[in-house]
Each structure stands twice: as C-alpha cells, then as structure tokens.
Regions:
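Signature of dsDNA virion morphogenesis modules
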Residues: 1-160
Length: 160
C-alpha cells in the first residue's frame, strides 16, 4: 500500500459482504460494508511494555467532511473499482458509521474483486482520511477523532 504523508489509514474488522437484503444500488455485483464505525474505541497500537493506545471516531466526525468523489480500491492501491462520480459507489452516514455500497460490475477487474468478496477471500474494509481535529485522553490512552477533513478512499482489504 503506498503511504501518503497527509493521510491516515484504518482497517475495520466489520465485514464486507456480497449479500444484502436491501441493496442501495441495483446490480448483481453489489457489495456493502462499513469503512468505519462511530463511538466504539478500538486498539490502535500496543507498545512493548504493554501500554495500549486506543482510538475512537466521534459520531459527528464526518459532519462537513470533504467526501467529494471518493473512490473504492483494493488495499488502497492504484486501481479504482468504484467511484462516487459515476454512481458506482455510495457512502452513507448512519447511526453505526460510514456505510459503503458499491457496484463492482463495470469492469472485469471489479467483477474479479466481487468474486473474491463473495467467496470470502476478502472480507474487511479500510479507509484513507485526514484529520482536522482530535483529542487525546492521557488517562485512558484514547485518541478521539472529532473532525475528519477529507475522505480519500475506501478499500476492500486482505489483511486489516
């Protein structure tokens, strides 16, 4: 994954699936999942001495964030599999987090990614973003992201 200096990347253990009772996009190559969830602290890092650093995304962190023409990639690398501008990617904020719905039927490579997701070979998500405002609680070792400046991409990932 090419790391960009101004961006942060987070993977989420929430599932990315090819099954859904209610589709946001009508296509046979439909996938959905969550790029992030709100108000649920997760382990960000553990030091050798056992000190654990946690992070949580505030429920209002994405309010007003730049989410113009976000793309969907695999492992945050180069190839675009879906994007907002051609309506093959929908990002939806709900009570749980940032929901992602995508149509992976427009290209052979996108259909290949769909097949990997459907087979359970790829089943997690990640996202790339920049932070505008944050807070750190030294007592609980928890970083709270209060405001996201921009969302760059959401990605299906092999290893979260």
């Amino acid at each position: 994954m090419p790391i960009k200096k101004e961006r942060e990347y987070r993977a989420l253990a929430a599932p990315l699936t090819a099954q859904s009772a209610t589709k946001l996009i009508q296509t046979e190559y439909y996938v959905e999942g969550y790029a992030t969830t709100f108000d649920a602290p997760y382990l960000l890092y553990e030091f050798e001495d056992g000190t654990k650093i946690y992070e949580r995304i505030d429920a209002h962190a994405l309010d007003g964030a730049d989410m113009s023409d976000v793309i969907m990639q695999y492992d945050h690398e180069g190839r675009v599999f879906a994007r907002q501008s051609n309506k093959t990617l929908i990002l939806q904020l709900d009570y749980k987090g940032l929901k992602v719905a995508a149509d992976l039927g427009k290209t052979d490579l996108a259909r290949g990614l769909y097949q990997d997701i459907e087979a359970g070979m790829i089943n997690k998500m990640s996202w790339a973003f920049s932070v505008a405002e944050e807070r750190y609680d030294r007592e609980t070792h928890t970083r709270t992201i209060l405001k996201i400046k921009k969302v760059y991409d959401v990605s299906a990932v092999s290893i979260p």
